[in-house]
C-alpha cells in the first residue's frame, strides 16, 4: 500500500528539479514505490572531488534530495518539510558510472520524520548510508 499523501508521477518529480542543484548534479528520480523513492546520480566531473572520486558532499546532496522529496510526498496542501539533520557514513569509494539512492522511512510523525537513504554503486555495493531528519512545517 502506498504511504505517499501526494499523487505525483516521476515526470512531475523530475520537473521540480529544473534550474536547481539537483539538475546541475544530474540527479534523476527513477522509482516511486509503495514505501520507497529512488534516484540516480552520475559519478563524473560534476560530482568528483579533486582526486577523481565521488565527492562526499555530492553523496550528501543526493541523500538530502531524496529524503526531502520523500518528506514532501508525505505532506498535505499547505505543508512543507525542512531538513534538520543529515548524517552520512561513506563505506566505499566510487570513481565512475552512477550511484543509486534508495530512500525509505524510519519514522513518520506529525511534526518530524526520519529517512534512511542508502547509496549503491553500479555493482549493487553499498557505498554510503545516510539518515535525514526533517521537520513538517505548516
Swiss-Prot record:
GO CC entries: cytosol
InterPro entries: HotDog_dom_sf, PAAI_dom, Thioesterase_EntH, Thioestr_dom
GO MF annotations, alphabetized: 1,4-dihydroxy-2-naphthoyl-CoA thioesterase activity
Pathway where this protein functions: Siderophore biosynthesis; enterobactin biosynthesis
Signal peptide start and end residues: none
Catalytic activity, EC: 3.1.2.-
UniProt-listed Gene3D superfamilies: Hotdog Thioesterase
Keyword entries, A-Z: Cytoplasm, Hydrolase
Subcellular location, record wording: Cytoplasm
Catalytic residues of the enzyme: 64 (nucleophile or proton acceptor)
UniProt GO BP: enterobactin biosynthetic process
Pfam family, one: 4HBT
Major subcellular site: cytoplasm
Described function: Required for optimal enterobactin synthesis. Acts as a proofreading enzyme that prevents EntB misacylation by hydrolyzing the thioester bound existing between EntB and wrongly charged molecules.
Subunit structure: Homotetramer. Dimer of dimers. Interacts specifically with the aryl carrier protein (ArCP) domain of EntB.
Family, per entry: Belongs to the thioesterase PaaI family.
Protein name: Proofreading thioesterase EntH
Lineage: Bacteria, Pseudomonadati, Pseudomonadota, Gammaproteobacteria, Enterobacterales
Amino acid at each position: 500500500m502506498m504511504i505517499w499523501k501526494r499523487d505525483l508521477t516521476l515526470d512531475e518529480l523530475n520537473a521540480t528539479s529544473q534550474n536547481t542543484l539537483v539538475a546541475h548534479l544530474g540527479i534523476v528520480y527513477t522509482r516511486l514505490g509503495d514505501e520507497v523513492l529512488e534516484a540516480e546520480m552520475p559519478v563524473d566531473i560534476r560530482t568528483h572531488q579533486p582526486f577523481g572520486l565521488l565527492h562526499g558532499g555530492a553523496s550528501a546532496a543526493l541523500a538530502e534530495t531524496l529524503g526531502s522529496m520523500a518528506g514532501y510526498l508525505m505532506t498535505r496542501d499547505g505543508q512543507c518539510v525542512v531538513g534538520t539533520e543529515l548524517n552520512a557514513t561513506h563505506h566505499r569509494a566510487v570513481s565512475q558510472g552512477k550511484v543509486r539512492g534508495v530512500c525509505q522511512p524510519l519514522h513518520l510523525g506529525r511534526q518530524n520524520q526520519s529517512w534512511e537513504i542508502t547509496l549503491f554503486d553500479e555493482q549493487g555495493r553499498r557505498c554510503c548510508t545516510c539518515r535525514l531528519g526533517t521537520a513538517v512545517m505548516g
